[in-house]
Design a protein with these regions (language model features):
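Hydrophobic, aromatic-lined core segments that form the binding pocket/scaffold
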Residues: 175-411
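Active-site beta-strand-loop-beta-strand hairpin of nuclease catalytic cores
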Residues: 67-78
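Compact, well-ordered interaction domains used in eukaryotic information-processing assemblies
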Residues: 74, 91-98, 104
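Internal, well-ordered alpha/beta segment that forms a basic, Gly-enriched binding/recognition surface
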Residues: 106-229
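Short Lys/Arg-enriched alpha/beta "domain-start" segment
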Residues: 8-48
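Intrinsically disordered, low-structural-confidence terminal and linker regions
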Residues: 1-9
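Active-site ExK catalytic segment of metal-dependent nucleases
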Residues: 76-84, 105-107
Length: 412
């Protein structure tokens, strides 16, 4: 159940501890942000999810009325989500009649050897599904994205008050430092994905994920897993992929231009034009300027490195002119450059920092000029690095604020 005191775990990440709320695990289940093609329960029985259930914001199980097929048997029941199997007993759910219809216990971490599964009040054993080995993305990346989505949804200038108090001479250095950490993190996440699925599949998954925007990232990853790059050539039926992928699409609040079916058609046009685009991306690295985040003014860096022309090259030679504008900028900075760096070891951090801002929360776009960091009246151009530095700072503040409520758990 979701409560104001939502359970929070603290885990060890790439560069230190991070917090993960149980609510995030519930979102993973709701959005299907895991490999649904190889679902198996702890007892070995296969699982098929027909419907994840309705997210319950009141008392009782986390999801009501899920439609499942367990070992060939169709079941309609509730789903409860926890970090550990033992949380069921710790929360005394077996004593609560509201949980008598729970048909599946979804946990993040695998149970210890010999650990007993959860049981309902009628003493019936509840099947258990472990999510961790099935996740599309690293836990730290998922927690970070969720925190930023939640924080930046608040239209409050007050959250930047501490930054506004930093002397102007120090503020730029602080945000550069935060941006550098964010760049290293993105490179590590890209490296993990390449190690897990290989270069071509990693590039394919990353491209579709970014085209999904924040509403349909998980659904796009599910599509990428089911339909590899080779399936997107001439004759690919986008309508069938959209309907039959098994992905959980979110269309409420999505602009028509960003509708997932429109983005799938966009990716098809991309692959038809450049079926070998992951290989082209690796070849392009030979011509890229490399280096760290030296304090070069963005305007000069863009001129020296020819970033405007490089933007055209990415659009034409890699994406086949199928993607442009700010979404192309996010493809370059969230996808292409981290992947290139992870695969080749050539640091594209300088390009990444000075690249065009791309899609960022509107609060970040307006805060940078207000703080005198970049934009109108600051003498510095808005760029991706400043935006990422700001996002990293926001996330760090939120992590510090929530850590006091976290419980110490082993790293994932």
């Amino acid at each position: 159940m979701i409560t104001p005191n939502n359970h929070v775990a603290e885990m060890q990440g790439l560069y230190g501890p991070f917090t993960l709320a149980e609510r995030v695990v519930q979102k993973i289940w709701l959005r299907g942000d895991f490999d649904r093609t190889r679902l198996a329960l702890v007892d070995g029985r296969p699982l098929e999810i027909r419907h994840a259930g309705v997210w319950n914001l009141l008392g009782g199980p986390d999801f009501r009325g899920a439609q499942l097929v367990i070992g060939g048997e169709r079941i309609i029941g509730d789903v409860e989500v926890h970090f550990h199997v033992t949380d069921w007993r710790a929360h005394r759910h077996e004593m609560d009649r509201a949980y008598d219809n729970v048909a599946l216990h979804v946990v993040l971490f695998p149970p210890s050897l010999g650990e007993r599964p959860a049981r309902r009040g009628d003493d019936r054993e509840i099947p258990t599904l472990v999510l961790l080995p099935l996740l599309h993305r690293d836990l730290e990346e998922t927690a970070s994205d969720d925190a930023l989505e939640t924080i930046t949804a608040r239209d409050e200038w007050e959250k930047f008050a501490d930054l506004a108090a930093v002397p102007a001479a120090e503020l730029a250095g602080l945000l550069r430092q935060k941006a550098a950490g964010r760049w290293r993190q993105k490179g590590c996440f890209a490296q993990l994905r390449i190690k897990r699925v290989g270069w071509g599949m990693a590039a394919h998954c990353t491209a579709l994920e970014i085209l999904g925007y924040r509403h349909n990232r998980a659904a796009m990853l599910a599509v990428a897993a089911k339909y590899p790059l080779e399936a997107w050539g001439v004759g690919c039926d986008v309508a069938s992929i959209y309907a039959e992928s098994g992905a959980i699409w979110q269309t409420q609040g999505v602009r028509p231009a960003n509708h997932p079916q429109a983005r799938l058609r966009q990716y098809q046009a991309w692959v038809v034009a450049r079926p070998d685009w992951p290989d082209r991306l690796l070849q392009l690295v030979k011509t890229l300027p490399t280096g760290g985040l030296e304090a070069t003014p963005t305007k000069l860096a863009r001129q020296a490195f020819g970033l405007a022309k490089l933007r055209e090259t990415f659009a034409r030679d890699i994406a086949g002119d199928a993607v442009g504008g700010t979404r192309l900028d996010n493809l370059v900075c969230d996808g292409f450059l981290p992947l290139i760096t992870a695969q080749t070891g050539e640091d594209a951090g300088m390009i990444w920092f000075h690249w065009f801002l791309g899609d960022v929360p509107e609060q970040v776009r307006t805060a940078l000029p207000k703080l005198g960091v970049a934009g109108r009246g600051s003498g510095q151009a808005l760029c991706h690095g400043w935006g990422q530095g700001m996002l990293a700072w926001i996330l760090e503040q939120a992590t510090r604020a929530s850590r006091s409520t976290g419980e110490n758990l082993p790293g994932a």
